[in-house]
Amino acid sequence: MATTNSSGRKLFGPVYRLKGCFGEDSLMISDPVALQHIINSPHFEHGPLLENVIDMLFGKKSLVSAKGFSASAVRSYQPVLLRAAQELSERLEDSCAPASAVNVCPLLGNATFNAVVQAGLGCSTQDLGEEFVANNSQIVALSSSQSAPHIFAIGACLPSWIWRTMIYAPVAAFKDIRTAKYLTHHLGAKIVRGKLDSARQGLEINTDVFGILLEQYLGGKTRHALSEEEVAAQFSALVYPGQDPTANTIVFGLLELAKHPEFQEKLRVEIQSNPGASYDTMPLLNAFIKVCGTVRFATVDHNLSIAQEVLRLYPAAALIQRIAVHDAVIPLSDSIETSTGQLINQIPVRKGQVLTLAVASYQRLERYWGDDAQKFRPSRWLDGTITSHGPALGPYANLLSFLGGPRVCLGWRFAVLEMQVFFSELVSKFSFALSEDDFVRMRFSGALIPVLPNGSEKAAPMWITRI
């Protein structure tokens, strides 16, 4: 379980020093008070790795506006997610065979890809063309490969101008990235033109993220509205981060359900007890409304508790880089002992210091999540194991799976609803069991991904039975 950094925390504590690329000093941090300070302080920005990757893949203008992911906007995307989940069910039915396991990774990847394209851009993946769909598969595969993180880790220490030069290197990975940048720029502009033409004809366009942003632009009611060019630039920032991380998290959730058939059945009973009910009376929708309204919940149903538990154990971004842009002092929850025996309750850092936020390790702290924090136990969210003590961190259930502060993932409501819809659809129609021959493991490859025991192939084979 090295990907969660829990072993390092148990050996050295919630803050310790380690060597990074080319021998530079870095701090590994899972202390909640320190994490809260770092994610909210203007003295810390994206680390060099993330900053360079964002620039290379997405460009400087690709900062998604929060307008398209407000609580009301996300509610309107629920039919899109339901259709995507139902289409996934149909594909699973076609894939199920009595004597063979099904690898759910590509199926879920395609489903989340379809969902984010429909909700974000207002079109289907087929509308984007075969070339983009094929290139998207290459980009997703690149993010899951073993070699790519090694390239990016070294590249994190290089100046930005070298990164901009590297993209033109005659390497297959960089060729795919060049193609992706061209296609996303072209398609983003094409979709914007189409929506603006529809708006001029009096047609409604505010049914997806792009449409909402363009309606704001056309209305001219706020100085924060994005221009046509800026809306088009959101294409890559919507599509790429909105598919694979959520798909991987859902895969890990299905694997945990397969390991815990008793809980799987309990969840199934809860879902199936509301056939044909109105949205207002469905536990799934009520859980969604609670999520949109507050981080503290008066009641939590089983479907929400599994979403929370999966996000706690399997955050897509298990490790996150930050860099100090000014000299700063980081406060700590408890005093720690230095190598010289001195007790300190804060850590001074210099400008340029690289920090690694150990999100997965924080979300396994026994103090906050219970003595069995390493285990999958959704009931911890129902039985009072988890209390509200400690600093408030992320936007959802005090988890950092979506980060927090000014750099919070703006699509967190969409991701949570997507998980709830997919789990409800799949668990109500299928039974999931582990494949006897394959034991799926975690690997950190820029994000947590499921892999086979050999560690080189992303896959999650399971026995799936139609109920």
Where are these regions (language model features)?
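Cytochrome P450 I-helix active-site segment
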Residues: 78, 82, 138-140, 204-211, ...
